[in-house]
């Protein structure tokens, strides 16, 4: 009888062991993923990213077009991008970018209240660094799990890279339309000029597009774009650019 009871006790704890084992595997995989992100970011201190998660997804979809299309992207150094565009993006997307730690707590809380009122995720309160984290590694899916990962990657970016490098990568990787990525590709796609020659009004109009680049690509010259661009243009003079360290 004692032997039978011992066998039953062993069988009873087996599910717990499996749960512990599965949890250990999950934790190990999660830590390995975070290490992968961190190593990639460290490498980008010295080399430029070849592509982003968003670019790779778009490249796959564009390859299915008839005829097949390609992602438009050309990396250019930070000093070859118009200061007008830099100021427009900061004025539009993240006015405290040069001095914040990658997070805007007030914006996050406002987004939380807005999402709660709507009953779904419609806003994220993302800074420029958070947007970059999402573009580099994550997907367009809106979920709190993805948001949590975005916050972790944001901390990595802010810890490893200086602000000017973060902004340089952002300027060269942000989406400006279906298959259009980075300032150089956007300048040539919309205005047929290099990013270094973008004027204040052109830059303001490009900045307006970022929350919904594909929509604005399909609805160029909308009244809203012009009105919003005028607001951004007025704020550009006060936009503080990051300094290299």
Swiss-Prot record:
Its EC number is 2.4.99.28. Pathway: Cell wall biogenesis; peptidoglycan biosynthesis. It is a single-pass membrane protein. Keywords: Cell inner membrane, Cell membrane, Cell shape, Cell wall biogenesis/degradation, Glycosyltransferase, Membrane, Peptidoglycan synthesis, Transferase, Transmembrane, Transmembrane helix. The chain crosses the membrane at residues 20-42. It comes from the Bacteria. GO terms for biological process: cell wall organization; peptidoglycan biosynthetic process; regulation of cell shape. GO terms for molecular function: pentosyltransferase activity; peptidoglycan glycosyltransferase activity. PANTHER family: BIOSYNTHETIC PEPTIDOGLYCAN TRANSGLYCOSYLASE, MONOFUNCTIONAL BIOSYNTHETIC PEPTIDOGLYCAN TRANSGLYCOSYLASE. HAMAP family: PGT_MtgA. Belongs to the glycosyltransferase 51 family. This is Biosynthetic peptidoglycan transglycosylase.
């Amino acid at each position: 009888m004692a032997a039978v009871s011992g066998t039953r006790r062993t069988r009873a704890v087996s599910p717990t062991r499996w749960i512990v084992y599965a949890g250990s595997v999950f934790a190990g995989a999660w830590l390995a993923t975070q290490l992968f992100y961190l190593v990639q970011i460290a490498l980008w201190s010295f080399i430029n990213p070849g592509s982003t998660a968003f670019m790779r997804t778009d490249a796959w979809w564009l390859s299915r077009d008839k005829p097949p299309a390609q992602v438009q992207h050309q990396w250019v150094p930070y000093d070859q991008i118009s200061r007008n565009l830099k100021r427009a993006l900061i004025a539009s997307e993240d006015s405290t970018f040069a001095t914040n730690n990658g997070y805007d707590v007030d914006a996050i809380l406002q987004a939380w209240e807005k999402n709660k009122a709507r009953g779904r995720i419609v806003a994220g309160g993302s800074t420029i660094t958070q947007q970059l984290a999402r573009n580099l590694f994550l997907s367009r899916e809106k979920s709190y799990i993805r948001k949590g990962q975005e916050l972790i990657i944001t901390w990595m970016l802010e810890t490893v890279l200086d602000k000017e490098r973060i902004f340089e990568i952002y300027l060269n990787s942000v989406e400006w339309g279906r298959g259009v990525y980075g300032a150089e590709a956007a300048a040539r796609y919309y205005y047929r000029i290099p990013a270094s020659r973008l004027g204040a009004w052109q830059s303001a109009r490009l900045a307006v597009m970022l929350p919904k680049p594909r929509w604005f690509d399909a609805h160029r010259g909308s009244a809203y774009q012009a009105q919003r661009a005028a607001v951004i243009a007025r704020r550009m003079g006060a936009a503080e650019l990051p300094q290299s360290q």
